[in-house]
């Protein structure tokens, strides 16, 4: 009887070890995939900014494939190709509850007016203006692709929001708005001078 119990125990331990090893390999593979994607985006962003006479010091990348409770808004130094800062950022709630987090793992994207959804694609960060939200500053976003061509008509802007945290919230998600990329007040105050005094337009690229 004791031998049988020992055999069962050893078997269970073996299965648990296999599960852990498989999980580690899976995480490793995901890390490689994400790193490859990041390198690809960095290369394309650099080429775009150079060819279109955009700001070649930095740009903003937002990776919507990342859980919204994790930092997925990146300030990319185009000179060093390094991520200098990362922050939480909201996405649009779509048909879900405003300020909820029901689509924290699977955002719905749309270019349609009143869809309350975020739009993927490259944006030109435009004029600085007054905002009802956060620190009362926003920047117009001009869509440069078919997937975000209605950004102007939809009044899509980059702004801060009191509801967005400075710290990661995972497994909870960042509160969802009506389609504008919104970051915390403190994060916005760090970025505002970079955008305000840039002599060339700055790229914001939202992708997944």
PLM regions: where:
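N-terminal Sec-pathway targeting helices
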Residues: 1-16
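Cell wall/extracellular polymer interaction/catalysis modules
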Residues: 23-178, 185-202, 208
């Amino acid at each position: 009887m004791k031998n049988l119990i020992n055999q069962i125990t050893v078997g269970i331990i073996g299965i648990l070890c296999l599960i852990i090893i498989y999980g580690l390999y899976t995480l490793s593979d995901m890390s490689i995939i994400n790193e490859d994607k990041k390198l690809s985006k960095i290369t394309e962003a650099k080429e775009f900014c150079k060819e279109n006479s955009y700001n070649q010091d930095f740009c903003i990348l937002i990776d919507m494939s990342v859980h919204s409770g994790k930092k997925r808004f990146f300030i990319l130094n185009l000179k060093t190709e390094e991520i200098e800062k990362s922050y939480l950022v909201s996405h649009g709630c779509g048909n879900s509850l405003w300020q909820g987090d029901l689509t924290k793992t699977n955002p719905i994207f749309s270019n349609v007016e009143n869809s309350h959804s975020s739009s993927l694609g490259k944006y030109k960060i435009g004029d600085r203006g007054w905002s009802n939200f956060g620190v009362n500053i926003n920047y117009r976003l001009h869509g440069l692709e078919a997937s975000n061509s209605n950004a102007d008509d939809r009044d899509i802007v980059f702004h801060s929001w009191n509801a967005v945290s400075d710290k990661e919230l995972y497994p909870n998600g960042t509160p969802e708005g009506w389609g504008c990329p919104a970051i915390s007040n403190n994060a916005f105050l760090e970025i505002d001078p970079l955008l305000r005094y840039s002599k060339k337009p700055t790229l914001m690229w939202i992708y997944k």
